[in-house]
């Protein structure tokens, strides 16, 4: 068998996240053990032709409706309410051509973070509609598929699409590891320049996208310029040495980034929307050092340590954003009550 980007890197991603070895399929699916996530929920693989959807559908509506009923008792008691929610989500996706991808993505993110209420309560009282169960991760469905064909303005087939409760939150592109002229940048270009313009509806619910050639993995949010895509790494002395020697294990970085708890953590606390110097709306997704640093600060606060920690930064590494991410997550931790966060800048 000759190696190409599909049967090498793409199938490697599927195998590591779900335990399905697509290169070993003959008459049926070969199931192996997926990478353990410390007893967390894992990704489940479904072949793209087995997803019950029309090729123009962004949302997997059957799965989404079941999830809405499972997570929200007031929808389970009246399933027609699920149709009303899905109708509103579809409306956001449709508006992308008018309001732009970043603004549509920001509006959809409010729903994903469970910040929207509807009059579904007693006497038409407004109650929060939960698309995702953040308190019990196992109560959500995590589905991964590959070669996902979608038709909006054009027909495109992203390599990897990852659904949470029937909503596509992650898009990934895999490139060949055996051609020196090809790198993760080619995959990022496909996503940022090609897919986001030809099938923008798929990216309205997007948390982040990733690109890899099997050596490095880079991530970016919607409309992130290629020069601002950032690597995702695991920072410890052993991994740092391995990376310098060219021996780092991409599988560890991949599974760390894409495990369900990390994905939902980034969705809740580690993405922000802002306006740049050109007064243009932008989305910012954390870099790996901001994610690790902010979580380390919060753990020290929870542990009651007097010294909350000192983090060394170089210029342009995103110090202000790290403080913002840490404050954003800290203020939503129930066990911390209502903490006062003091940020000093020079």
Predicted regions located by residue number:
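ATP-dependent helicase/translocase motor core
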Residues: 2-345
């Amino acid at each position: 068998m000759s190696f190409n980007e599909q049967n090498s890197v793409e199938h490697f991603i599927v195998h590591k996240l779900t335990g399905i070895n697509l290169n070993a399929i003959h008459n049926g699916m070969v199931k192996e053990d997926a990478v353990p996530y410390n007893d967390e929920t894992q990704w489940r693989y479904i072949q793209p032709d087995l997803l019950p959807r029309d090729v123009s559908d962004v949302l997997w509506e059957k799965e989404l409706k079941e999830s809405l009923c499972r997570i929200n008792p007031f929808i389970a008691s009246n399933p027609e309410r699920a149709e009303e929610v899905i109708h509103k989500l579809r409306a956001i996706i449709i508006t992308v051509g008018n309001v732009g991808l970043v603004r549509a993505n920001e509006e959809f993110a409010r729903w994903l973070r469970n910040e929207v209420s509807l009059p579904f309560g007693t006497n038409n009282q407004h109650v929060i509609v939960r698309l995702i169960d953040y308190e019990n991760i196992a109560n959500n469905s995590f589905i991964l598929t590959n070669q996902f064909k979608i038709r909006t303005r054009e027909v495109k087939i992203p390599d990897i699409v990852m659904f949470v409760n029937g909503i596509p939150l992650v898009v990934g592109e895999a490139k060949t590891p055996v051609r020196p002229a090809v790198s993760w940048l080619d995959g990022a270009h496909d996503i940022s320049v090609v897919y986001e313009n030809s099938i923008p509806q798929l990216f309205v619910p997007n948390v982040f996208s990733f690109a890899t050639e099997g050596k490095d993995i880079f991530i970016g949010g919607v409309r992130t310029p290629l020069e601002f895509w950032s690597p995702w790494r695991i920072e410890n002395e052993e991994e740092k040495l391995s990376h310098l020697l060219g021996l780092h294990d991409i599988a560890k970085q991949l599974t760390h980034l894409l495990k369900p708890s990390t994905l939902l953590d980034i969705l809740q606390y580690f993405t922000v929307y802002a306006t740049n110097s050109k007064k243009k709306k932008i989305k910012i997704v954390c870099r790996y050092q901001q994610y690790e640093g902010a979580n380390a600060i919060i753990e020290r606060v929870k542990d009651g340590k007097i010294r909350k920690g000192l983090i060394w930064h170089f210029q342009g590494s995103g110090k202000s954003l790290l403080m913002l991410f840490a404050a954003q997550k800290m203020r939503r931790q129930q066990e911390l009550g209502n903490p006062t966060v003091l940020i000093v800048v020079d």
